[in-house]
């Protein structure tokens, strides 16, 4: 497609894929990222917080009122993602950062541009702090290991499969 478009003086500017610590096929997505880098195409990550699952503190089981869909998502993914979220919490505690910042820095570490849905002022203020620090290689590797060993990932198309 890239060469076809070049022949027509057109180009792909961005590619948007599901990319988070809970995405399936992250190795495939990393291959797509490499192709994007080679062709100067921005790689955008949708659902980098995995519908908020990656923001759920592993030590808190009741997180208040949620919609029917959110309740289903959290009930389905809370236990299988506990170890991953514990690793995220360890990093967030060491960095005095939120779990959301850890998840987004995992994206940034790889040169990925996350698309984040923010609904509340406190979320906006929190995400602004993501630019004040970077993951170390060790922290990145800890997250990668925990992500790979996570037994339940999001479906390939979470918008039609949840």
For each of these PLM feature ranges, what is it?
Residues 1-162:
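Beta/alpha (TIM)-barrel catalytic core signal, keyed to glycine-rich beta->alpha loops juxtaposed to Asp/Glu
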């Amino acid at each position: 497609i890239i060469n076809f478009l070049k022949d027509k003086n057109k180009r792909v500017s961005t590619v948007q894929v599901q990319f988070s610590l809970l995405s399936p096929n992250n190795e495939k997505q990393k291959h797509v990222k490499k192709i994007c880098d080679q062709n100067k195409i921005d790689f955008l990550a949708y659902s980098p917080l995995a519908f908020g699952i990656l923001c759920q503190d592993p030590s808190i089981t009741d997180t208040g009122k949620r919609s029917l869909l959110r309740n289903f998502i959290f009930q389905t993914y809370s236990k299988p993602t506990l170890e991953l979220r514990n690793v995220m919490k360890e990093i967030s505690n060491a960095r005095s950062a939120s779990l959301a910042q850890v998840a987004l820095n995992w994206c940034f570490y790889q040169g990925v541009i996350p698309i984040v849905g923010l609904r509340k002022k406190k979320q906006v203020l929190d995400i602004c702090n993501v630019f004040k620090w970077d993951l170390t290689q060790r922290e990145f590797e800890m997250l990668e290991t925990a992500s790979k060993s996570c037994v339940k990932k999001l479906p390939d198309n979470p918008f039609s499969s949840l």
